[in-house]
Amino acid sequence: IIRTRIGRGYYTQRDLTCAPISKCSYLQRATLPNETAFYGCISDSNKQLEYGRIIGLYECSKLARSETECIGRQYVTASQWKILQPLKCISFINDKTFPRTNDLSKQIRFIIEAYKKANLTTVQKELGNFLTTEFCKQVRPNHNHEYLITATIIHDMLYANEYNYDAVLYPSVPVEGRFGINIVIKPDIVKNKLSLYRVINQSYFKSEIESLLRIDGGYDNKGHLLSAEKQDADEKICKKLGIRSLKELPIIK
C-alpha cells in the first residue's frame, strides 16, 4: 500500500499513519467530520511504486489537480506499507465506474468482471449504480457536503456491527480510475495488520508547460537514510520544465 502526505520530514509510522482528529473537522470522501482513517492506494503490481506515487500526488496536492496556468513546487512524502495479515474489504465499484476511461487499472477491471458474474437482483444493481455514481463524483472545492453519502456509507461499512470491515476500496476520482485503486482503513487495523516499510522524499514541480514528480531520497522504517541521490539533477528538471531556475517556481505548502 502507498500512502502520501504533503510536506517532508516525516519518517516514523506515527507521522505517516492517520491525521490527528483535531485536523479532521470537515467531510471527506471517506470520512465524516471528527473521524480519522488511513487513506492509501494499491497500484498495479508491475509498476506499484510509480503508479502509487501518481495516485497519491493527485489525491493530496491541490497544485497537481489545478489548471495548467498554476505553477509551483511542492514537497511530497510517499510511504510504502506491508500488509501483515489479510484485510476484510468491500468495494464500491461496478461496470458504471468511469465507463469512459479506456485504461482502467487492473484492480478495477478485475472487480468489474467479478461484479458482472454476480447473481444480483434489479434492486441490488440499481443501488450499486447509485453508489458507484457517488464514489465517482467530482466534487468542487468548498462543496465538501457532497461527500456526505460516501462518507456515511464507508463509516457504516467500517464500524456498524453487521458489517465491521477492515477497509473499503473505491476508485480514485482525480485520475478517473487509472493506475490503481484507493483504500481507506480503520486506524486500529493499521496498528495490527500493517507495517511501515519505506519512506520516499519527493519534489513536485509544475511550470506552465510541464509537470514532474522527482524522487529525492529514501529512508527505511527506522528513519535511517537509504539514499540521498536525486532522481534527476536540478538542471535537467529545469530543462524539462522550460525554465532557467527552480526559483522561478514558488514553494507551495
Task: Give the location of each predicted region.
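Short active-site loop/helix that positions an aromatic residue
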Residues: 53-64
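DNA-binding interface regions
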Residues: 32-33, 51-54
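Short, well-ordered beta-strand elements within core beta-sheets of diverse protein domains
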Residues: 36-47
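Active-site periphery "cap/insert" segments of enzyme catalytic domains
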Residues: 47-49, 159
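Active-site and NAD+-binding cores of ADP-ribose-processing enzymes
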Residues: 1-31, 66-253
